[in-house]
Amino acid sequence: MSAQVIAIDAMGGDFGPRSIVQASIACLSATPSLHLTLVGQPSLLEDLISGLPAADRARLQIVAASEVVGMDERPSQALRGKPDSSMRIALELVRDGKAQACVSAGNTGALMALSRFVLKTLPGIDRPAMVAAIPTQTGYCQLLDLGANVDCSAENLYQFAVMGSVAAQALGVHRPRVALLNIGTEDIKGNQQVKLAATLLQSARGLNYVGFVEGDGLYRGEADVVVCDGFVGNILLKSSEGLATMIGARIEKLFKGGAFARVAGAVAMPLLKRLQADLAPARHNGASFLGLQGIVIKSHGSAGVQGFQSAIQRALIEIQENLPQRLHGRLEDLLP
């Protein structure tokens, strides 16, 4: 298998580079064909990888960056005021063909602005969209947009649907069912932009559009791709993650309530732990910026080692599936 090269913004996120470097080392150990470029402060990064075996160290490069984009900085500040930020340098490595993907846990708005500036969008795409996998009763669905575009036109939603369908196919879904998230399934429901987007999708050639889906239908697995604006999508994503964490905590507390509960817990806990692990936000961490001329994966800023590993794994899949090129080819067929 040919090598995959991923640029890592090692300075992004809420907790600094330690967990990012630990996740990077774990991915190197698990994937012999993987090469990583850590972008950030060299002296700090060298200390964190000092104990790495020589075989893995040979597949790990450090590129210096003197600036860091803060989590509370405006995108315009990152774009104009920090030309040597770790985030920007990582994206430029992708642009220059020195890496095939970029993974960052940094400021979402800044990452999107820099990605659009450095990598540019694919022909026909007005705005990139953030997409991630959401667990359902039957497997997973791809949900987009997750916060990159708070206000969306019908044309934006249509483009998101096309991109989400291609991404789902790249992940192995045959003829993915595409739906618009709405407050009801009837044609009269929804705001004007959602209704107009539905009209566009109904006439789309080669797209398996199945209509509107409500929030509960998403979790029942009624669609493989669910499209909404970034305001709704971000709230849905964060609510889902909070609910999964809360349920896990409540179950653990329940089985510590008394002697009988502890006995029942000893029997049930292995299965419940498996369920908790399957639904854990860390397992599904890593949102893809679809619509760019390059692969960019956004990790949660609060992601730990396991979560950042998941983001790197998503980048690996998109490299292996050559996702931007696949998108470009399908967009020519599906966009009006």
Swiss-Prot record:
GO biological process, one term: fatty acid biosynthetic process
Family named by the database record: Belongs to the PlsX family.
Origin superkingdom: Bacteria
Pathways per UniProt: Lipid metabolism; phospholipid metabolism
Task performed by this protein: Catalyzes the reversible formation of acyl-phosphate (acyl-PO(4)) from acyl-[acyl-carrier-protein] (acyl-ACP). This enzyme utilizes acyl-ACP as fatty acyl donor, but not acyl-CoA.
Localization per record: Cytoplasm
Disulfide-bonded cysteines: none
Assigned EC number: 2.3.1.274
Protein name: Phosphate acyltransferase
Keywords linked to the UniProt accession: Cytoplasm, Lipid biosynthesis, Lipid metabolism, Phospholipid biosynthesis, Phospholipid metabolism, Transferase
Keyword Transmembrane helix: no
The protein's assembly and partners: Homodimer. Probably interacts with PlsY.
Membrane among keywords: no
GO molecular function, one term: phosphate:acyl-[acyl carrier protein] acyltransferase activity
Organism: Pseudomonas putida (strain ATCC 700007 / DSM 6899 / JCM 31910 / BCRC 17059 / LMG 24140 / F1)
GO cellular component term of the entry, any: cytoplasm
Reaction equations catalysed: a fatty acyl-[ACP] + phosphate = an acyl phosphate + holo-[ACP]
This protein's encoding gene: plsX
